[in-house]
């Protein structure tokens, strides 16, 4: 399966601020086993479900070719919808191709 043009990571504004000046993006506890990423049409739904207490979220666009690790397109356990998960890797700032603030 070819790589998508972009994948997206959703961060809280606080997480985004905390990683400024660092070599990689900040990750949350939910990213311990693998890093959760999204396709464009999944961003709003994921933000509403998992970031409902945040009035705004930061959506970071990433070039998947610049992500170290294994990018896997798979369903969450017990689910049917496919998501991108990055195993054995991290999100370097060098992979960031765009950033936008989205009202949630």
Model-derived segments and their meaning:
Residues 2-104:
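Conserved, structured core segments of small domains
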């Amino acid at each position: 399966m070819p790589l998508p043009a972009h994948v997206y990571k959703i961060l809280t504004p606080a997480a985004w601020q905390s990683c400024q000046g660092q070599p990689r993006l900040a990750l949350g506890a939910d990213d311990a086993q693998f890093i959760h990423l999204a396709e464009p049409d999944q961003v709003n739904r994921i933000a509403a479900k998992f970031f409902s207490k945040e009035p705004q979220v930061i959506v970071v666009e990433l070039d998947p070719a610049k992500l170290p690790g294994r990018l896997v397109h798979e369903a969450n356990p017990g689910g049917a919808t496919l998501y991108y998960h990055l195993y054995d890797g991290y999100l370097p700032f060098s992979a960031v191709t765009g950033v936008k603030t989205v009202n949630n």
